[in-house]
Structures are given as structure tokens and as C-alpha cells.
Amino acid sequence: MTRIHINASTPYDVVIEEGALQRITDYIKPLKPNCRVIIVSDSNVAPHYLDSVKANMEHAGYAVCDYVFPAGESSKNAHQLIDLVEYMAAQSLTRKDLLIALGGGVVGDMAGFAAATYLRGIDYVQVPTSLLAAVDSSVGGKTAVNLEAGKNLWGAFKQPILVLCDPATLNTLPEMEWINGCGEIIKYGFLDVPGLLTQLENRPLIKHRGSVSGVIARCVQAKADIVEQDERESGIRALLNLGHTFGHGIEKASHFEVHHGYAVAIGMVLMAQGAVKHGELDTEALEKLKALIKAHDLPTTTTISKEEILAAAKHDKKSEGATIKIVVPTSYGHSELKVVTHEELATYLD
């Protein structure tokens, strides 16, 4: 077992342990001994784990209800969120009760936002069942849904009281979801995580999955170190958006047919290519990045136009009027924040 403590406004632990899902009540009882519980999941994850988690919670004395919505990024919208919160109200859940987000990034984002806003906030636990959620979105307290204008534009910061990651749940993931998670993992390699790039080069995770628990722990620790310094993204936390400025544009323009980790991988390459043009990154580093991305079966190019990507960037959360904060890789394994105008941003895609 690996336990990583995050000293945020609500301090909590991230527990990474094989088989932890079967003992979920051992972790929740000390935190919430007497309350009602709502488990939020989606149509992909619920058939695998909902019944067993619900039975374990009920056996431990909890009264449990559940809410399952259609899987996919297209469900992460205001209408689905309101339906969830209306259901919570219909169940007469109180501020003393608990929400469990059982699923990948979409489940965690939407369920977390429901927890942040229902009755002005109730406790919630993240139980990530996808690689992407395990290494990134379940940690740090960002919650949101998408709007027509762009991705994650309606949200709140709300830290969970626990993140419980059972790597055994990754065994039921389709191949695409493993690849999807690798996009975010490679991102961490460019945020000064010692040895991560070398490990991924020598033993690509997509082919050496036995090392996944250690990789998850390294990514979570890296994110914890940043979140503890900048919980609400007023400074260095923006580094975690490497690949996301262009990546979110690709997702939106594709109507979310391009999955998040895939889009982040392409976004990293596009920004790195722009950095080479601007003399901020050498060509060798760019080629090594491309090779690493390809080694994890991720794409490095897109057919989506520059205009569509830049249009989405105007709605990016890091945009402030005429300027936008971007994350630029400046060496192999290191990235820096930079404020540019939207006109200057366009030159990174020329």
C-alpha cells in the first residue's frame, strides 16, 4: 500500500492499494462512521463494481442509494448535473452525508461538482477506476462540467476527504483507456518528475503494466507537491495544464470523439513544435517527445484546423482578456509558464 498525504485546505490521503475496493469501508468508517451514502457511477463502471461496493457499504451499516448516468464526456454537462443534484435532493441527503464518485474522470468531475454545490457542500470520496483519473483528475479538488462554449467552464474547487485507488480496477479497462491515461502520465514527465521519462522510455507503461502502481504513486506525489503550494491555480498549478490549451480545443472541435489523454498528447507536441520555432526548445527534445508518445500508441498529429483549436483557446480558463497563460516545454523533462497574447499563441501553431 502507498499512502500519500495532501495538505490542502481539506487535508486528505490518497491510498493506492491492490484490492482496496473490497475493503472500502475500512477506509471510510474512520472518516464518516454514521451517514447516508450516494454512489455516483456511469454505465461502463457500474456493471463491474457498483453492486459489490453498495453491498459492502450496506453490510457496514450505511444506508445507500445510487445514481448511474450514461458513460462518456458528452454526459458531463449542466443538464446531467442538475438531474444528479435533483436526485440527491429527492433522496433527502443532508450535509452530514457522503457522496462516493465511483468511476473515471467524467464521474469524478461531475460527482465532485455535485458534492461541492449541493447544500453548499457535502463530503465526497474519489474512487478512480480509470488510469487517467488515478494519476490526475481524482486528485487536487478540481470539479467541473462542460458548457457549449468549452470544456470544464462551470466548476468549483472542492477537495475530497479521501481518494481510494485500487489498481485492480484497471484490469477491466479497454485498451483505449490505458492509452488515454498514458497521455497525462507523459505530461508529468515534463514537470520535473525525476526519472519518470527514463522509466517510460525503457519500459513503456502500455507494454509493462505491472509497474502501474508505482507510476500512479509518482504522478500523484508530483501533483500533491504542486497542489499544496497552489491549491486554487493562481500560480504554478497551471503547469499541470501542459498540453491542455491546444488539447481542449482538439477535444471540443472533435465533439469529444478525441479522448482527453489523446488530445493532451497532441497538444504537447503542438506546443513543443511551437517552442522549437520560438527557439525555446531544441529539436532533439521534440523528437524524443514524439517517440515517447508513439511508444505509448498515442497520436502526435491532428486533422483539426488551427482556427478551430485557437477558437476554443479563447474560452480557456487560463485566458485573461487579451492574454493567456500557456505551458511551454523548454527542455526534455522541464516546462515553464509564459503569458502571451492570443495573437502570439497563434504563432505556436504556424
Predicted regions and their residues:
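ATP/NTP phosphate-donor binding region
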Residues: 1-97
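A glycine/threonine-rich phosphate-anchoring loop and its flanking beta-alpha core
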Residues: 15, 113-203
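Buried hydrophobic packing segments
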Residues: 84, 111-115, 185, 250, ...
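Non-catalytic interfacial helical region
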Residues: 85-99, 111-126
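Short glycine/serine/threonine-rich phosphate/pyrophosphate-binding segments
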Residues: 106-113, 134-135, 249
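C-terminal charged capping/lid subdomain of soluble metabolic enzymes
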Residues: 183-185, 280-350
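Active-site segments that bind and position negatively charged phosphate/pyrophosphate groups
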Residues: 199-307
